[in-house]
Amino acid sequence: MSERRLLLVHAHPDDETLTTGGTIARYAADGADVHVLTCTLGEEGEVIGEEWAQLVADAADQLGGFRIGELTSALSCLGAGRPRFLLGAGHFRDSGMAGTASAADPRAFVNADRDSLTAAIVAVIRELRPHVVVTYDPDGGYGHPDHIQVHTVTTAAVEAAGSAQYPDCGEPWEVAKLYWTVTEASALESGICRIGDIPDGWRLPEPGELPSVPDADVTTVIDVRAVLDAKREALSAHATQVTVAPSGTEYALSNDIAQPILAEEHFVLVRGAAGERDADGRERDLFGGIGH
C-alpha cells in the first residue's frame, strides 16, 4: 500500500471529474493510491447529441452500462485505475431529481436503507484504509438527491469505520481527514469572467446559477494546473454528459451553460486536523498534517 491513500465517494459517473478530476490526477501522478467509489451508473442522465440519444432511460435504458465505459476511460486519463461501484455495478439505480418518477423506483439510491449503505462504505474504507476521504457537502453540491445521500452515508461511514461498529465489515480503520468538494465563489466568478468565445448554442451562466460556496468556507485549495490536460481528457471521455469547448478552457453539460475549467479545486475540511497553511490561511495539500 502507498503511504498516501485517497478515497473519493461520488454519486454518478462524471461527478469524479467535474469537481475533483484535477485532484485525482495530481495525487495519482505524485504516487498516491487514489480510489474512486461510484454509487450509481447515472442511468437517469440526459444525453448530449443524437448519436447516443436513444440510450436514455425513457428509450433503450442502456445509458448506465454505456457510462461504465466512459468512467473507465476517464479514470484511465486521470491515472486512477478502474472504476469501483458500491456493492457492484448496477446494484443501485440513479434516482434522478427529487419529485420525478425515477426517484420513486425501489432500486433508486435515494430509497436504499441508509444503515446498509453505511455498512457497505465502511467495508470499502476498512479494505482500502484511506488516510483521506472526499465527498459532497450536505446539499450535495447542487441538491441532487443522490449527492445528498452520498454525503449522509459517507459521513456516517467515516465516523463508524474506526469504531467497533459493523464488526462484519473488516478491521477498524480511522480516517485521518474528511473533506467536502466545493467550488469557491470568487474563483468561479473569475473563471466565468475569463470566458471568451463559446460554441454556438452555449450561453454564459446567470449570476448565482452555478453552485458555489462563500470564500470563507474554503479551507483547502489544490493547484491542478500541471494536470489540466488530464482533466480535459477525462471530461471529454464523458461524452454523453460533457462537451469541452475547442478552447479547452470551458465545458458544458447538456444544458449548454458554459463553465470554466478552473486551475484550482476547492475543499472544506470537516474532520481531522489541518496541515500547514499558506498566507491566506488555507491548506495546499489534502494529506497535510497526517503522520504516515
UniProtKB/Swiss-Prot annotation:
Disulfide bonds: none annotated. Binds 1 zinc ion per subunit. Zn(2+) binds at H12, D15, H147. Keywords: Hydrolase, Metal-binding, Zinc. It comes from the Bacteria. Its cofactor is Zn(2+). InterPro entries: GlcNAc_PI_deacetylase-related, LmbE-like_dom_sf, Mycothiol_biosynthesis_MshB. Its EC number is 3.5.1.103. It holds the Pfam family PIG-L. Gene3D superfamilies: LmbE-like. GO terms for molecular function: N-acetylglucosaminylinositol deacetylase activity; zinc ion binding. One of its GO terms (biological process) is mycothiol biosynthetic process. It catalyses: 1D-myo-inositol 2-acetamido-2-deoxy-alpha-D-glucopyranoside + H2O = 1D-myo-inositol 2-amino-2-deoxy-alpha-D-glucopyranoside + acetate. HAMAP family: MshB. Catalyzes the deacetylation of 1D-myo-inositol 2-acetamido-2-deoxy-alpha-D-glucopyranoside (GlcNAc-Ins) in the mycothiol biosynthesis pathway. NCBIfam families: mycothiol_MshB. Belongs to the MshB deacetylase family. This is 1D-myo-inositol 2-acetamido-2-deoxy-alpha-D-glucopyranoside deacetylase. It comes from Rhodococcus jostii (strain RHA1).
